[in-house]
Swiss-Prot record:
Keywords: Antimicrobial, Fungicide
Signal sequence residues: none
Function: Has antifungal activity against P.infestans.
Keyword tRNA processing in annotation: no
GO biological process: defense response to fungus; killing of cells of another organism
Tissue: Expressed in the skin and the flesh but not the seed of the fruit.
Stated name of the protein: Antifungal protein
Length: 30
């Protein structure tokens, strides 16, 4: 999936905050 570039910053913050919590942390959501 893609996300609006205007939301990228928010997405980046969200990913940085939560991605490490998932199994195999650092996995990115597309």
């Amino acid at each position: 999936a893609t996300f609006d570039i205007q939301n990228k910053x928010t997405y980046t913050v969200w990913a940085a905050a939560w991605a490490p919590s998932y199994p195999g942390g650092x996995k990115q959501l597309d």
